[in-house]
UniProtKB/Swiss-Prot annotation:
Enzyme Commission number, as recorded: 3.5.4.16
Naturally occurring in which organism (per UniProt): Rhodopseudomonas palustris (strain TIE-1)
Residues at which Zn(2+) binds: 118, 121, 189
Family affiliation: Belongs to the GTP cyclohydrolase I family.
An individual GO BP term: one-carbon metabolic process
Protein name, UniProt field: GTP cyclohydrolase 1
Keywords carried by this UniProt record: GTP-binding, Hydrolase, Metal-binding, Nucleotide-binding, One-carbon metabolism, Zinc
Region forming the signal peptide: none
Record lineage: Bacteria, Pseudomonadati, Pseudomonadota, Alphaproteobacteria, Hyphomicrobiales
Enzyme class: hydrolase
Domain of life (superkingdom): Bacteria
Pathway assignment: Cofactor biosynthesis; 7,8-dihydroneopterin triphosphate biosynthesis; 7,8-dihydroneopterin triphosphate from GTP: step 1/1
Reaction(s) this enzyme catalyzes, per UniProt: GTP + H2O = 7,8-dihydroneopterin 3'-triphosphate + formate + H(+)
Amino acid sequence: MDAKIKPIRGTNPAEGRPEFQPAELEPSEFLEVAVQPDQPRPSRAEAEAAVKTLLSYIGENTEREGLIDTPRRVVEAYDELFQGYHQCPKEVLERTFGETAGYDDFVLVRNISFTSHCEHHVMPFYGKAHIAYTPVERVVGLSKLARLVDIFARRLQTQEHLTAQIAAAIDEVLKPRGVAVLLEAEHTCMSVRGIAKKGATTFTSRYTGVFRDNPAEQARFMSMVRDRG
């Protein structure tokens, strides 16, 4: 499902350089299950046949012992790798807790590992997500933020889109005073093909509310993310 986002030039006060931030997403584009149960799709047999066709395309003998079960295994792997299409981000965030004891600062969960696949080459990109939000009255279980990342990551993505979806979902469901999301990832479509530059890391960020409006909050978020102590 394609979200209607476009780059908007802004400034990252924490680093003093221009950055691009996506426009607002429509809630229907990121809060619900992406693939409905009654949505027409190819059968498993058709999917396996498609894999077999690709193997033949690269010049392989699809009848040799090592490849006989490969189409089935690939389809099963896709069921796991892209299960995010069948999961609901909104449901993950809806259970919240009110016992905050007057807590009025932001909550940060950093180093959430993730693996996704780029929508251009269907090759993995992987890295870490750092998420902060400033609650109003209620908070969400910390594991739910990691689950949210997994739901969106287990879909075909761009890193920019993934960053925007995570922030928009938290903003829409929890309605906090602000959200900050920073993703850092290595893209295998760049490290193992094309220019083949291993170790190159891509950073994307998204700020809403107090993080967008207050440069000091952005700077504090970035400082805590980078603190390895």
